[in-house]
């Protein structure tokens, strides 16, 4: 049996661009893309913390060090500039792989620089 598990995420990135007439995708600063382990053209889910919208598109590389998070094409309707988003990719693992795999978690500052990285999501407490 294959399990669909979190592969990586960019947590609390901010939308810097929305390009309605650009070919659909999400442009992600190349440094963030690499650090998270995202691949160009990889399917990503985006969760807009600001407005609650959730949608899927694919990742493309934006200029490294630019801090760009650009929602392109139809995805541009899903957020306003400055909205906080979580960008996730998932992968299929067999049960053995799933028991040892640790996702790459990248936590972003307000300017989309790296605040922290981790491989474990803390236990939620009351």
UniProtKB/Swiss-Prot annotation:
Its EC number is 4.1.1.11. Pfam families: Asp_decarbox. One of its GO terms (biological process) is alanine biosynthetic process. Heterooctamer of four alpha and four beta subunits. Belongs to the PanD family. The active site is at 25 (schiff-base intermediate with substrate), 58 (proton donor). Its cofactor is pyruvate. Substrate binds at residues 57, 73-75. The modification Pyruvic acid (Ser) is found at residue 25. It comes from the Bacteria. Its main location: cytoplasm. The keyword Transmembrane does not apply. One of its GO terms (molecular function) is aspartate 1-decarboxylase activity. This is Aspartate 1-decarboxylase. Binds 1 pyruvoyl group covalently per subunit. Pathway: Cofactor biosynthesis; (R)-pantothenate biosynthesis; beta-alanine from L-aspartate: step 1/1. The gene is panD. It comes from Psychrobacter arcticus (strain DSM 17307 / VKM B-2377 / 273-4). GO terms for cellular component: cytosol. Is synthesized initially as an inactive proenzyme, which is activated by self-cleavage at a specific serine bond to produce a beta-subunit with a hydroxyl group at its C-terminus and an alpha-subunit with a pyruvoyl group at its N-terminus. Catalyzes the pyruvoyl-dependent decarboxylation of aspartate to produce beta-alanine. It catalyses: L-aspartate + H(+) = beta-alanine + CO2. Keywords: Autocatalytic cleavage, Cytoplasm, Decarboxylase, Lyase, Pantothenate biosynthesis, Pyruvate, Schiff base, Zymogen. It is an enzyme of class 4 (lyase).
């Amino acid at each position: 049996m294959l399990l669909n598990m979190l592969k990586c995420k960019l947590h609390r990135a901010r939308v810097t661009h929305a390009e309605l007439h650009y070919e659909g995708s999400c442009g992600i600063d190349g440094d963030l893309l690499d650090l998270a382990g995202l691949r160009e053209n990889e399917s990503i889910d985006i969760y807009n913390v600001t407005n609650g919208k959730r949608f899927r598109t694919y990742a493309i590389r934006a200029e490294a060090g630019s801090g760009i998070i650009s929602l392109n094409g139809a995805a541009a309707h899903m957020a306003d500039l400055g909205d906080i988003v979580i960008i996730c990719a998932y992968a299929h693992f067999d049960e053995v792989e799933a028991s040892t795999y640790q996702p790459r978690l990248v936590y972003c500052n307000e300017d989309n620089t790296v605040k922290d990285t981790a491989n474990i999501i803390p236990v939620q407490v009351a």
